[in-house]
Every structure is written in structure tokens, then in C-alpha cells.
């Protein structure tokens, strides 16, 4: 999953920065935010094992939102109301807000997103287009577990039957 995005970035760029941030503005249900896996120490070990030169940026909520945890409203030409957006109003405003903020802080030439979250990939592309940020958004193929399930940090919440 995410390690494959890093591998691609390492192959195509002189410097790779990985952001790790659980964004509160993406969660409609506060319980989902509390249950979301947070494994920063493990993640940093995996990243260092992949390549010790990767820069890890793991800001706090305060670093990002400076005391005001609010998402910026975006017009994604209606894409935010389709598919997942039908069931999670405001979710993609949260996505747009955090990705825009991270792009402003890091100033990447290239940003890599998995095609597993295809609607999110389209949303990020639309946000970059509308805000005229100078970032090349690159979609990367889905990586799967040996049983065919798409790799995801949320998989740890599933049991064998699911």
C-alpha cells in the first residue's frame, strides 16, 4: 500500500517526504476518529527500513490547524456529492483542506496517491486544478494482500469472516 507509494517517489525524486497525519476534519463520526489506527512509531520503523533518507513529517493537529480545526469549503464540481460523498457530507472538504495545507507546507513537485481511494485521487486533482497549486498528482496502482483484499490500515479492524 503506502510503502509502494514511497518506493515510487524514491525512484522518481531526489527527496521523498512522507506525511503522517490523522485528519479530524475527514471524520463525520467522532467515534470513527477515535477508532482510527494510530501506529506512528511502527510506521516510522517501516519507513526507515525502506529507506533511511525518507523525511517523515508527522505534525500535530495544532501544527496544521493552529487552534481552529475547521475544513475549508471546496467546490469539486459535484464530485464531492457522488459515491462516498453521498454518505459522508463534508468529508471531501476535509480531504481538500488537509492536502492543500500539506502541499503549502511541503511544496512538493510530485505527490503520490493510491488508486484504491479513487474518488479521493480525483478530488485531490480537482483541488490542485482549482487552487492552481504547482503539484503533479500521480495515481499509483492498488496493491493487494495475498487473499486479494486491497491493502489498507483499516484492514486490521476486520475479522476473518469479513
Question: Language model features by range: what are they?
Answer:
Residues 1-162:
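Nucleotidyltransferase catalytic core that binds NTPs
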Amino acid at each position: 500500500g503506502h510503502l509502494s507509494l514511497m518506493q515510487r517517489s524514491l525512484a522518481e525524486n531526489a527527496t521523498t517526504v512522507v506525511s503522517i497525519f490523522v485528519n479530524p476534519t475527514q471524520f463525520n463520526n467522532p467515534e470513527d476518529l477515535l477508532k482510527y489506527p494510530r501506529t506512528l512509531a511502527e510506521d516510522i520503523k517501516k519507513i526507515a527500513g525502506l529507506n533511511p533518507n525518507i523525511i517523515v513529517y508527522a505534525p500535530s493537529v495544532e501544527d496544521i490547524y493552529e487552534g481552529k480545526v475547521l475544513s475549508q469549503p471546496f467546490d469539486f464540481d459535484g464530485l464531492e456529492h457522488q459515491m462516498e460523498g453521498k454518505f459522508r457530507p463534508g468529508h471531501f472538504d476535509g480531504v481538500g483542506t488537509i492536502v492543500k495545507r500539506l502541499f503549502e507546507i511541503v511544496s512538493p513537485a510530485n505527490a503520490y496517491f493510491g488508486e484504491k481511494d479513487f474518488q479521493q485521487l480525483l478530488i485531490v486533482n480537482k483541488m490542485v486544478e482549482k487552487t492552481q497549486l504547482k503539484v503533479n498528482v500521480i495515481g499509483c496502482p492498488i496493491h493487494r494482500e495475498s487473499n486479494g483484499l486491497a491493502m489498507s490500515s483499516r484492514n486490521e479492524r476486520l475479522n476473518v469472516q469479513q
